[in-house]
Amino acid sequence: MQFLNMFFFDIYPYIAGAVFLIGSWLRYDYGQYTWRAASSQMLDRKGMNLASNLFHIGILGIFVGHFFGMLTPHWMYEAWLPIEVKQKMAMFAGGASGVLCLIGGVLLLKRRLFSPRVRATTTGADILILSLLVIQCALGLLTIPFSAQHMDGSEMMKLVGWAQSVVTFHGGASQHLDGVAFIFRLHLVLGMTLFLLFPFSRLIHIWSVPVEYLTRKYQLVRARH
């Protein structure tokens, strides 16, 4: 048990991270034709907008919340944001984003499996990744009742300590998870596994998000007379 704990929370994060970065780079260099979202909207528009919007809004909220919530050093906000308040914000905002993502993910998965035209262009990797994302989202929602048992933020700070130890390459990161509920550990392992699978799936299109679109100049479109 001690070996598994050390492997999954001291070693596995770096395996997943290395595959995530190196795999993405190699795919960009050698597989640019596959570097796409492979949208299926033209094949079946029914319910696509609702499902896609719910899923993407939810997952964006989850990503932003996890990124800043887990990786922001405590000293940067302790003077104006008590840990108990941060815990409540994480539970409510994360819960709302999780519900949106879960509903959208289930609708997208249903469409992938039961729409004949979409199913014909769907790969096993598509179904696997979307299924894992739905499961991961459900696991995240299931952690909320466990978080509610530690409203002082102690459980959350253990997870924060682990994440910050990993990204700053401090040894013994797994020690921060002593006493943490199994549901959190499962959530962490599946999350790292998604990073491991990232370069081999259509998730790769996230790297090409058109951020510059937000700041580009307006385009003038003139009618021909």
From Swiss-Prot:
EC number: 1.7.5.1
Residues that coordinate or bind heme b 2: H66, H187
Cytoplasmic side: 30-47, 113-124, 199-225
Keywords: Cell inner membrane, Cell membrane, Electron transport, Formylation, Heme, Iron, Membrane, Metal-binding, Nitrate assimilation, Oxidoreductase, Transmembrane, Transmembrane helix, Transport
Induction conditions: By nitrate.
Pfam family, one: Nitrate_red_gam
Catalyses which reaction(s): nitrate + a quinol = a quinone + nitrite + H2O
Residues of the signal peptide: none
SUPFAM superfamilies with a match to the protein in the record: Respiratory nitrate reductase 1 gamma chain
Binding sites annotated in the UniProt record for heme b 1: H56, H205
Broad enzyme group: oxidoreductase
Entry membrane topology: Multi-pass membrane protein
Protein name stated in the entry: Respiratory nitrate reductase 1 gamma chain
